[in-house]
UniProtKB/Swiss-Prot annotation:
Record GO terms (molecular function): enzyme activator activity
Subcellular location(s) per record: Secreted
Organism: Squalus acanthias (Spiny dogfish)
Any one of the GO BP annotations: lipid catabolic process
Family assignment from sequence similarity: Belongs to the colipase family.
SUPFAM superfamilies listed in its UniProt record: Colipase-like (SSF57190)
Name this polypeptide is given: Colipase
Length: 39
């Protein structure tokens, strides 16, 4: 079961921790220090 408070099915540009959260299955960091976003 997914953890409570974990967002799934996110749209492009939304903050993500892992690619499993994104509709596109692509979670990318633009730089090493920035937060990752769905692509």
């Amino acid at each position: 079961a997914p953890e409570r408070g974990l967002f799934l099915n996110l749209s492009a540009g939304e903050l993500c921790v892992g690619s499993f959260q994104c509709k596109s299955s692509c979670c990318q960091r633009e730089t090493g220090l920035s937060l990752a976003r769905c692509a």
